[in-house]
Curated annotation (Swiss-Prot):
Primary gene name: rplM
Family (UniProt): Belongs to the universal ribosomal protein uL13 family.
The keyword Cell membrane is assigned to this record: no
Molecular function per GO: mRNA binding; structural constituent of ribosome
Record-given protein name: Large ribosomal subunit protein uL13
Amino acid sequence: MKTYAQKASEVQREWYVIDATNQTLGRLATQIATLLRGKHKPTFSPYIDGGDFVIVVNAERIRLTGRKPEQKMYYRHSNYPGGFKAVSFKQLMAKHPERVLRFAVKGMLPKTRLGRQQLTKLKIYAGPKHPHAAQQPKVYEPRPRG
């Protein structure tokens, strides 16, 4: 009996919608990364983009534990002298709440072309509305802790 290897043309994608209200950032991001990579499917293959589309609503209501909302920093550099920028979690949530979750999920995906392709299947919206009703997304309930 031969081992089954999925081809890119055989991939069947689902659309899931996740409500981020009162979800912890890291725990939610790991579940999203699993869906995007397709690791929840029995046909998972690390070199095929077999994951599903994920729509996240209410990204502005995501939370962190402890004192992290004040202490967590996001850094970037423009590659120019003196171009180092730092912004706190609170500041980023006030301006662009969807970027916080995107950064967390991006760090959990492969740092390759495949990872960048998988990240394009993530759609994040700060509020409760999204324009993907035509895809008939299924409501995804994150796994309970414990």
